[in-house]
Amino acid sequence: QPGVREAFCLQTCNRVEAYVVTDDAETGMAALDRYTAGLEGVRREMTHEASLEHLIRVACGLESLVLGEDQIIGQVRRAFVTASEAGGIGPVMEDAITKAIHVGERARAETGINEGVVSLGSAAVRLARRELDDLAAEDALVVGAGEMGTLAARALAGEVASLTVANRT
């Protein structure tokens, strides 16, 4: 789109975020309007330092449903590669995203934020163990074979009487 010098999109099971680099905020907002039309109440707009701080918090797992979850850092990396291959990454985005990945890795290494329950799937399994008398006697259904569904299925495997994974494809 005219006026957009760089663009990056992060899509996970819990979020879709778009970042653009433009010469002025108005051009950036107009570029993003194409993708957020009709999504009243779910859009958050940030500029400059606030957007970098947010991306760092996302990479650290501080904005995740499960604090410190590990999947997000890999998702940021993959989105960075995809945007790079598409020609969307320039010096501003490269600096911001590599900084966010570095801080996310460092936060995990130095704080242990990702110890224990590190995904929504493992949190669900922990809750099921607590709520059900005998998980080994239960049948389990995991809906979806994406990243979270796979993590949940792995966490449940061997702990339930039977495990079924349902997927739309």
Language model: regions and residue ranges:
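A glycine-rich (often HGG/GG-containing) alpha/beta subdomain
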Residues: Q1-L67
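Glycine-rich phosphate/diphosphate-binding loop of Rossmann-like nucleotide-binding domains
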Residues: R129-T169
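Glycine/serine-rich phosphate-binding loop and adjoining beta1-alpha1 elements at the start
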Residues: E40-E138
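Short phosphate-engaging motifs
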Residues: T27-G28, I72, M148
